[in-house]
Amino acid sequence: MAQECKVPLVHIEAGLRSYNDEMPEEHNRIESDHIAKWLFTPTQQATENLKREGFKGRVIEQVGDVMLDALQMFQSSAVYTEKMGPISFFHKPFALATMHRFENISSPERLAFLVDQLNTFNDTVMPVWMPLHPATAVRLKEFGLNLTVHVAPPVGYLEMLWALKQAALVLTDSGGLQKEAYYSDKPSVTLRGETEWVELIQMGASVLYDPSENQPLAPIALNMLSSFKPGTKAPYGDGKASQKIIHALGLA
C-alpha cells in the first residue's frame, strides 16, 4: 500500500530470515525489505543478511529490538485478570504455551501431534497454561481435537507479561514470545524447525522443536529447563531502539 501511494516505507525488524519459504511472514519480510527506504535491523545477523543479499542505496541501521523497549516500558504494569483463570493456578510451577503458526495449525496430523504432546506434558511434567489464539480454536474444533491443558481466552499484552513473569517455562511458536521469554530470564522451547531469532538458539536461551520429526516434547523441554542459564540482553540492543529510529528519521 505504501509503495502504491508513493509513501516512503520504514521497515523495522528488517533483515530477519528464517529461510522457511512456506511461511507467509518470510515472504512479507523479504518484500518489505525490497521496497523500504529505511531498513532498521534488530541484530548483527539481520544486518549481515541484508548486506549479503546486496541491498544498496538504502539506509541500513542496526538499532536493536523494539520489543525489548516495550517490555522494559510496560513490565512494571503487568497485571492479572480473572479471565486468565484462578490465581491459585499461577502459584505453582507451570508452562506458558501459545500456538498460532499456519504450518502448525493448518495440518490435522501436525496439530493433532502437537495437541497430544502438550496434553502429555501437562499430565506428566507440569501444568500448561495456554491462552488460545482464535485461529487455533477454529482448527481444533474443525479437526475434532481436544486440549486438556488449562485453556484461557486470548489475553492482552499486560496480562501476558504477568503470566510470563510467573511461568517456569515457555512453549511457543511465536517469534515475539521467544524473545520476551529471554528478556524475562525464562527458558523456552520454540515449536518450529527454525527461527528468525537465531541468537536465542546459539545462546542456549531456547531450543528448536520440529513437530515434523515426531519426537516427544517432554524430554527436550526438561533438558531446556535444567540447562538454561539467564544471559545478557546484548544481542538485541539496549532497550532504546525506538529512540534510535526516531533520531535516524530526523523526527527527534
Which role fits each region the language model picked out?
Residues M1-M126, A135-A252:
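Nucleotide-activated sugar donor-binding and catalytic core shared by glycosyltransferases
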